[in-house]
């Protein structure tokens, strides 16, 4: 089939992503590459140039983008001014050759960049290696050109797992639990303003005065569909190949997430 002739499934360590993907792209094979896209940002840029030259599709496996908890937010206006993210896991010998920044934190960095849509202005990072020879616990404060700030924490030495993100903006507070797959939204609306713009039942919690205006506080817990994120990711990749459309997580976005990861890693280990 056309699809069979244009893509090639493979599994390899992230440090060899570039070499394997390079060979596939040179043979005009579309690639779905696990995150991080490559071992270095320099390799990612080179891969993007090759993909454009050979007119092939490259999608990167930032699978959290397909988490159904994140999908429900398409019905909301998300414009963060402050983001707090925690991604914690219990220790496992798996992937100890790569830092927690590359393995876990990169998920939240990708999502935050996708939400904020502004260039990064400043990064302050700290971390420590406890059980391995790479960073096991890391924290980064990322300041964006538009004034937004993100505080991101990742650990692979936690007693219990956690994958949560909290988003604060002038008119709303949004809490996302990627692990348990639920979303809670608190919104401030003017009296008479319809809170049901996404057909989600809203509960009025009370009213406050803000900016010399009376505002109403609403709570919403939108239903999260039962979806398999990995399957949705693969479907999106196949759809892009068959229909020629863009992929949800392109190589450019993945390369930028990796660039930020490299800055954080360099700060911690310099």
Where are these regions (language model features)?
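C-terminal helix-rich "cap/oligomerization" subdomain common to oxidoreductases
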Residues: 9, 222-224, 232-270
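A short helix->loop->beta-strand "cap" motif at the edges of active sites that frequently abuts
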Residues: 27-29, 54-57, 148
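A contiguous active-site-proximal alpha/beta segment in oxidoreductase catalytic domains
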Residues: 38-95
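Mid-domain beta-loop-alpha active-site segment that forms a flexible
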Residues: 61-68, 91-122, 135-136, 253-254
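Contiguous beta-strand/loop segments that form the cofactor/metal-binding neighborhood of enzyme cores
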Residues: 109-188, 192, 224-227, 231-244
């Amino acid at each position: 089939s056309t699809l069979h002739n244009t893509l090639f499934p493979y599994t390899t360590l992230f440090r060899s992503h570039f070499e394997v993907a390079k060979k596939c792209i040179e043979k005009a094979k579309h690639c779905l590459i696990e995150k991080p896209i490559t071992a270095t940002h320099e390799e990612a840029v080179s891969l993007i140039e090759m993909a454009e030259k050979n007119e092939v599709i490259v999608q990167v496996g930032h699978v959290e983008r397909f988490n159904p908890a994140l999908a429900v937010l398409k019905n909301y206006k998300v414009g963060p001014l402050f983001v707090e993210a925690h991604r914690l896991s219990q220790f496992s010998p798996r992937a100890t050759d790569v830092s927690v920044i590359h393995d876990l934190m990169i998920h939240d960095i990708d999502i935050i960049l996708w939400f904020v849509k502004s260039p990064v202005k400043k990064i302050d990072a700290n971390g420590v290696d406890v059980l391995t020879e790479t960073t096991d616990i890391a924290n980064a404060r990322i300041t964006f050109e538009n004034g937004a700030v993100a505080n991101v924490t990742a650990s692979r030495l936690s007693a219990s797992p956690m994958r949560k993100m909290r988003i604060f903006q002038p008119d709303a507070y949004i809490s996302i639990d990627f692990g348990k797959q639920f979303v809670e939204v608190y919104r401030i609306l003017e009296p008479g303003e319809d809170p049901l713009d996404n057909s989600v039942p809203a509960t009025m919690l009370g009213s406050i005065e803000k900016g010399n205006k009376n505002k109403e506080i609403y709570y919403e817990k939108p239903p999260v569909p039962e979806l398999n994120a990995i399957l949705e990711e693969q479907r999106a990749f196949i759809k892009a190949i068959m229909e020629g459309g863009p992929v949800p997580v392109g190589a450019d976005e993945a390369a930028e997430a990796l660039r930020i990861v490299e800055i954080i890693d360099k700060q911690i280990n310099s």
